[in-house]
Amino acid sequence: MDDILSAALAESGLDFLCQQSSPTPSTSGSIHDDAGQSFSNNTHTPSVSQFFDETSNDSHSSSAYYTPMATPFVSTEDGGVPTSFFGMDEEDGGCTIMTTAGTSGSNNIDGIEDAGGGMYYPHVKVIPRKHTAPTVNQSEPSTPTVTIVPKKEDPLFETNTADSPTPSGDTSTTASYEGNDGLEDQETTSDRQNPMFVQTARSTDGRLDTPSTSATVSPHITSSLTQRSHTSSPASSASEGTVVPPRKKGLPITTGSIVKRTVQTKDGLQTQYLKAFVNENGEKIYKLLSPVAASAVARGTLPPGMGRGGSTIGRGGTMVNKNGERLMVVKNHVGPNGQMLVKRMVSPAGTRIVANGGQGRGQPIYRAVDGSNGPTHLLRRTTTTGQPTRGAPVGMAARHAVRGGTVYGGGNGYRVNLVGRGTGGSTMVHHQPLNRISSQRSVAPVGRVLNRGALRNGAQQPLHVSTSSPAFHYMEEQPSPTTNGMVIQAKTPGAGVIQARHMQSQQSFPSGGPARVLMNRSSTNAGLSRMVGGGYDQQLPTAPNGRLMIPSTAVRVPGSGMASPRLQTTPQPLTKSQKAKDEMKMAYQVGREEALQQRRNDLEDDEENLGYAETYSEYTPAKLRSGMAHPDSVVESASLSSVSPPDVKYQISIPEYLIDMGHISALQLEAVIYACQMHERRMPSGERYGYLIGDGAGVGKGRTVACIIFENYLQGRKRAIWLSVSSDLKFDAERDLRDCGAPNIPVYALNKMKYAKISGKENGSIKKGVMFATYTSLIGECRGAKSRKYRSRISQLIQWFGQDYDGVIILDECHRAKNLVPTAGAKPTKTGRMVLELQKALPNARVVYASATGATEPRNMAYMTRLGLWGERQAFPEFHDFISAVERRGVGAMEIVAMDMKQRGLYLARQLSFRGVSFAVQEVQLSSEFVKMYDAAVKLWMEARRQFQTVIETMDEEERSTCKTVWGQFWACHQRFFKYLCIAAKVDTCVQLSREAIKAKKCVVIGLQSTGESATLETLEEMGGELNEFVSTAKTVLYGLIDKHFPTDASFSMGDRDIFKDFDDFERPAKRRKTRETLSFLGDVGFDTWTGVTTGMGGRVGDGVTKNITRGLSGIGRSSMSSSTGNTNNEDANSTTSESSDGSDDEVENDMISENGGESGDLESAREEAEGARTLEDGEQDEWVKALLAEAESSSDDSDEEVVKDEDEDEEAESKSGETHEQEEEFNPFMCDFTNDDPWAHNQQIVEDTPQKDRKAKKRKRDEEEAERLREKVRKREERREKKRRRAIRRAEREKQRRNEELQARGSATDFITSSRICGNGSGEQDDINPMLIKTELLAAVERLAPSLPANTLDQLIDEMGGPEYVAEMTGRRGHMVTSETGDVMYQRRNANAEVSLELINMEEKEKFMRGEKLIAIISEAASSGISLQSDRRAINKRRRVHITLELPWSADKAIQQFGRTHRSNQVSGPEYVFLISELAGEKRFASIVAKRLESLGALTHGDRRATETRDLSQFNMDNKYGRVALDTLLKTVIGQAGTPLIDPPKDYKAGEFFEDMRLYMEGVGLLAKNKTGQYTIEKEAATIPKFLNRILGLPVHAQNSLFHYFSEIVAELIAQSKHDGTYDTGIMDLGTGDDQVRKLETRVFTGRVDNGSFRVEIHKIGVERGVSWEEAMELHKEHSNDDDGFYICHPGGANTANTKKVAALVYGIGKIRMDNGARLYAITRPSTGRSPKLMTMADLSKRFHKVSIDEAKEVWKQQYDSAANMCQHNYVYGKCRTESNGTYCEVGRRTRTYFVLSGSVLSVWPIVEEVLAGSDRKSSRMQVIRVRTEQDQKIVGLLVLPTHVRHLVQQLETHCGRSYVKTEP
């Protein structure tokens, strides 16, 4: 047997440790070996090993009881002693374990011939109780032989044995029991049973001389890698004895297999195991096998002679025991290398085990030809038919090279498989019942193994490696068939997998050498790949068995379970891109090192839990009983779940085995059946009904529609059309068909077809299959087609499908066909028209609409003509009638539509549960540099708008008519431009979040909507195909607007003359006037002169706009200096010019200089007077630069700033001004010699003046000290002279800087708008306006602003995250900008480094992400539909997804599609959604739009608008009726029409008068207009939320934040008022969810006539008892005992208490707090109406209530409770009620309240409901949906009908319907 143990040791790399010194004998409690013999000159006395239970109080005594285990051990988390899953108690049916002396004369031990020099283990005898077995003659020898034939590299080691003689005889076995007193009792076991025992002998010459009557045992050794301390057992000795535990009686017999089940406990999911037992009554019962906290441990030492390569191959013996019971014995063995887990199995009777799993006959074995035992033996295969012959032993190195996994088998049909080799853990023995087949392996391994550092092939599939620590596994494999005696192992493991972890050890090896750690990741290559990938190139030591060894002191490679040293490299200067790559590598590394547990989301906020429970309910098919459950939790909105679908009548044709095997889940099958069932019906118009699958993203719509196609295919309808949004989804369609069991249905791409007959020869004669097309290809046309009949794709499809054919048309992702009936001012989309035309042309087709967002808004349902909601003989004749009715009634009407469609069997909408999914909105703080850049862009846009308007106003009517679309283009570009700026502000935060997620062992998905590819390509074309920097998308948008859409006319460009060629001929005075106006505010605008003059010296200031301001103003100053000194050399003054400037601009610049020379000269002279006449000597060049920069900062229109100057300083400055000008003018940093001048000398004087240590050191030191004293004296004198001057200039600079900053950040609107006028046409002379000149000036301004604008967001993100090698990009663009290793930026096609075409690059990137090769994915709209990026259980990359929404989609359908990429079925964990929103108020416009769409989506698509309230974006939803009223109030307040403002203006607005500034700003963005009289008016269509939130993007940051804050305050106030009035629309109203007692009193049923179709509507009369008696109030009071909890009294009459009565209330805190101020919230329970749904703070309560004692409240409570039974609250408090005095029943404050609910097919009687609800005044009142749950647990959802309308509604329904009757409830 020890050859197997040695093989396991070798597999773990521990075989070289097997040579040990002989242990010291001990006689105490030992087992003596009576047959010690000498084998091959090596005498060995075996050591003893004692079993004991660590839970025993006397664990080291020989009487300790050893618990036999039926299952493997599982180690504890902290590396402690492994514990068994199954303990043993009085009824477990244990066995007695004894050790017995070995007997000479037999070489058959444990069914395996002993291997000489093998590892020694104690002899164990396992004695089952209550069973007898034939005795065995232990003395009969058995001498089978074996011949080993080695072969070359990668030997496949297999052996075979023939039948061995069965021992016979009736020899009694003697066992000794050693009690606690140390005495031994001898007893004979032959009358009881023959013991089974496990015994290991030793041999060095290949002979076995020890008898064996043992059970078959399959040992297994696991290397231990955790340090543990052990003490020597008192029983450790070389002598032998026997230990028998106390006998147990009355134990049941175990039978059958172990049953595993998973249950939910308080600690989470746990796996339990049940074992079948036969009790004393003969009954078969199952008992839970409980874990025990201890294990049996054997302690001993290794005997000598345990060398490598000395093992022989054992042969099988015969099982003697006939009881048919298998037992597993597991123990911990303590060897010199720490603990080793030894597992032995006792197999059933008649089983023989051989090393290669053979049965001994006709099986091949291997013979060693030369008798060598090296690792490179040549093996050849032979076959024996009789007794195996003996051969030379095979070395361990040769044997452990087999990585396929040795199989041990037996004749009884059991296979014992040695699995887990090289899987990062150690080898395990595994048994599995087989069908009496041979277990021979005769094929070469094909997996990757490691031997002597080389990669080899090995057949064993790698086991799963634990992500947290190295692990070994017990893996059950399915029974495998055999072919010619060979076992073909199943690749798929069985269900039961028990894994345990290493007890890791850092113990040094006994050889005395350095501590080593085995690299045991052969099969998975995890260690090697990481080591090689990490650049590990050191020479590693090699073990004697050929294994690679590395020092244990080396740094651990993350996740590899091994160590590897890190290379020490010299740091090199890195570029920004290289730094980004290194940071991403570091994030990957940290992510692997830190195995963070997944955060549990069970403890959520109370409000979230409440919202989830109220909004959703777990979904199970209501009328379907077949099919397997969906792999993930699926929910349905509560309102939809209250409606039952119709009965199932359709008989499905899909084979049952596909359904039973889970190819389609039950809820998917439900949609298939209902769709096919609906397809059997016809509409009144004769068209076939369609079906709408509204399941959310990730539920599995693709597989559902694939099954619908499959079902129709089985019915003989073999042609189908599948329309989707992306050609990449064709592969998903094929996958879905394959997964649902229809792999043979072909799928063809329409865009690959020629424009000809599809069934013709040109297209391959396609007669049947699925024609896959995109919506974009559907509108394709080809005028060059041979036949006009096939010129368009839709005509091709119609011809191929057949006009009368009844096949399936799938409109997948049908939200792309929306906007068939768009809003005013837009045109229907061509896609929508094509979809409508296709349905009309094929009236018999079976149409399926499939989309998670198919009905985002009712207007987008226009193409769903097959749902029967409108049309001939429907409730709505035309779609216009339907849309007007639904939109007028709001969200409640949409909920009714969704419920009605489900009730008709037209619609199902389920979605994945949001459990485990977290949502967060994170606002990004804006930097000051970004704010400056943003405000500069705002100024440029304001000036552009002013110039657009000015030029258009000067045109006549005819010219103006050609510019109708200019403003549409302008505002569209305006929105895009600032959207790009908003996104750019979030890039840094996004990169930081991404790196943190990678470090936290997660992966990242970033959502974008646009890629900016068009801007990149446009710029690339302009630059001639070469780019050296990232393209600014924002700059391209603005530049393109001015360049392409600025209104210029030929009459304004002086006829046919070229304005640029004749630029010199323009009148100078006009330009001079413009220049004067421009120059005066350049310091405030943030631009330099309009020609783009810059200088190279200003670059040291900083980044962004500050840099531009400095450069530009430095240029102005230098130009002024040039003019004042008479230097006309413009090249020196104009060192750098803008790209848009041409030669003519230089002359214009000269004019500007001459016009402003005096002003600038005065400014410069003032600066020179302040600074003094400095030279460039004595290392002060840096001071010159500082002076120049200070000059640039102080340059402004206030050139006559008040600077206090001394007269002497003035004269000194004047005398030296000429010299200074000359030096500054001639200064060129590239022409000066700085070798002798150190600009940092004044900061490093001590370093410069330190003398070298030479012979003249002292003298030089004295000289230097003297020179230093002189310099210090001069310096102090200079400082004194300049002290006053510097103080004065600093004082002036601070004042100016303060004014500038206030103007930039919080300047008044007048100053801000004035400073934005770059193009001066303020004279009002129309002759001075030249559009081409203005256009040129605007383009030049754009170029000056461009350096500070952000680059393309997508390219910047990829670059900062390490480049394309780390980021998987799934977008629609063809190329991207990449940074090379040298830092150069270049344009590259996306598939440049890939092996796939550009069409498949997205799929390739997706696969890399799902495989974990890339952990960051960026998706755009092109990849948003259909692509699955969730943590799929089938994927390699199972990390949790962090979905960062960098750019919020503009519509809900796009948002839902993006959210659904990472939240789908079959996922390991739900994603984390992070919505990044900058603090720019205008950007909340996008959040508002998405939130509004999500709310509407939840209402219509999922029947409940609150379904999306868990998404945090709902707080930004302003686009509702409250927002619209608030906007109207805001606009009227700003222009002064609203009188007293509803809300006071923001107090923190300090820039100016708030309303006055907002008027100017809102005029600047087109929201307000000023008429001829100077009065402000509201622009047409300005009072819309989207336009308002879009336009305020164009305001400076401080202004838009203040304005949006003011707008939000108005919205909050309006909502608060509506809640106070009780008119706030909260969605679906719930009855019966709290303590209310709800009963259905009466139901009136109405059924439709035949001509009106079959429908059914019901009016329910619901009674609600909501009062709370005094006894119930006291019970509630006892549960709340805080200080503020208790009874309160209120006087509703106020001061008039004499004529009014008191009302009581019970107030108690509920633990919630307000989100705004953190105040605790309290619930209010009244005696008449119960608990109020409105929560209040104590501050609000104190205004109306005061606390009283219980006795005082009791009387008031009872009186109010009794009165509420028959009067309203008005009568009770005031003694009268105005409502009842008018003859109307008043229910306010009554204990019992009556509701009337209209349910059923409400859409069928919608016109009647509409007429009744509108009333006589035709007001558009809201439609309140109510959900009722009665005491009888009945659910009713419908419309709430007011009591005043009930009588009229009943009359109208009786007239319209064919029959009505009353159903009274008991």
Swiss-Prot record:
It holds the Pfam family Helicase_C_4. Transcriptional activator that functions upstream of the let-60/Ras and let-23/EGFR signaling pathways to positively regulate lin-3 expression and thereby promote vulval induction. Plays a role in excretory duct development. Plays a role in male tail development. The lineage of its organism: Eukaryota, Metazoa, Ecdysozoa, Nematoda, Chromadorea. It comes from Caenorhabditis elegans. Its main location: nucleus. One of its GO terms (biological process) is positive regulation of cell fate specification. Residues 1142-1152, 1194-1213 have a biased composition (Acidic residues). Residues 19-63, 132-151, 156-253, 561-581, 1112-1308 are annotated as: Disordered. This is Protein strawberry notch homolog. Residues 1164-1177, 1262-1281, 1290-1304 have a biased composition (Basic and acidic residues).
